[in-house]
């Protein structure tokens, strides 16, 4: 919402059931429709009757998903969503924070705008919140032009979004983080998979949700959308303990450590107080460390 690209008169269709409250606050008084599935059918249905335009004066239709996100760590088929969005004159926006650019090339798959918080890129050392906004190439092969991408670029350039002015320290943190990003992300992905497989075999845990498990509803889709593995996040339900009780027996660092750093971070799903499944959104330590804490 802080980018300012969504304007009054536009419609925003989003799959973000774990952040419904944030959408309500950030887009108050806007035409926002939250869908229950990250599917083409759900987005198309929520867009019916809206006369979208790629003209500057609008109105504009926005489709929003996470490359990995929502309750259950869903993975939408960005290829089919991207094609359907263009047919509907919609602009597909993907929050790529969880998977990161290492784990998902959302712009190549069909997004016109990709957003990514840079906590992980900076290894948790950034002094403030940094978010990268990237627009897809508008010039395609054989001199074809992607009208949606070209229009998204024009909107972003004309909305008055703040230009990033990095201090020398911030630029240094970002540069050093980029040098080690691939190795760190591969370790996160590998350890998340090991943790998911361990939890799936643990009798004290149920409903392990991780795109790399064949039991995940989007496993087949994820194999063609995600790269280098299936992301750094695992979500699960505890059998006889609510999230608050579970957190109380763990060291504070599992809740308070900087996002993107080397320590595992645990959180309970937003909007579901008392639920028995605190999802492990960011796995940072070797799998044994996470497993012993349970």
Which residue stretches match the model-derived regions?
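Conserved PLP-enzyme active-site core in the AAT-like
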Residues: 1-204
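Conserved C-terminal alpha-helix-loop-beta "cap" of PLP-dependent enzymes
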Residues: 204-291
């Amino acid at each position: 919402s802080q980018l300012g690209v969504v304007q009054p008169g536009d419609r925003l269709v989003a799959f973000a059931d774990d952040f419904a409250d944030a959408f309500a606050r950030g887009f108050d008084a806007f035409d926002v429709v939250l869908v229950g599935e990250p599917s083409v059918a759900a987005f198309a249905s929520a867009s019916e009757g809206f006369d979208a335009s790629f003209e500057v004066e609008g109105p504009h239709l926005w489709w929003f998903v996470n490359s990995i996100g929502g309750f259950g760590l869903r993975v939408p088929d960005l290829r089919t969503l991207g094609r359907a969005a263009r047919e509907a004159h919609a602009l597909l926006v993907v929050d790529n924070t969880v998977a990161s650019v290492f784990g998902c090339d959302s712009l190549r798959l069909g997004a016109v705008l990709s957003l990514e918080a840079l906590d992980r890129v900076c290894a948790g050392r950034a002094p403030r919140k940094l978010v990268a906004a990237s627009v897809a190439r508008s010039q395609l092969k054989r001199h074809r032009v992607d009208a949606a991408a070209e229009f998204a670029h024009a909107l972003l350039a004309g909305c008055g979004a703040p230009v990033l002015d990095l201090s020398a320290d911030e630029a240094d943190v970002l540069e050093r983080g980029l040098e080690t990003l691939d190795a760190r992300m591969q370790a996160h992905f590998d350890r998340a998979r090991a943790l998911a497989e361990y939890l799936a075999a643990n009798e004290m845990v149920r409903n392990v949700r991780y795109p790399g498990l064949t039991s995940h509803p989007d496993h087949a889709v994820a194999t063609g959308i995600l790269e280098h593995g299936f992301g750094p996040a695992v979500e699960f339900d505890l059998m006889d303990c609510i999230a608050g009780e579970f957190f109380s027996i763990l060291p504070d660092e599992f809740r308070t450590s900087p996002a993107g750093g080397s320590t595992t971070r645990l959180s309970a799903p937003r909007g579901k107080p008392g639920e028995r499944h605190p999802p492990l959104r960011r796995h940072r330590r070797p799998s044994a460390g996470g497993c012993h804490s349970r």
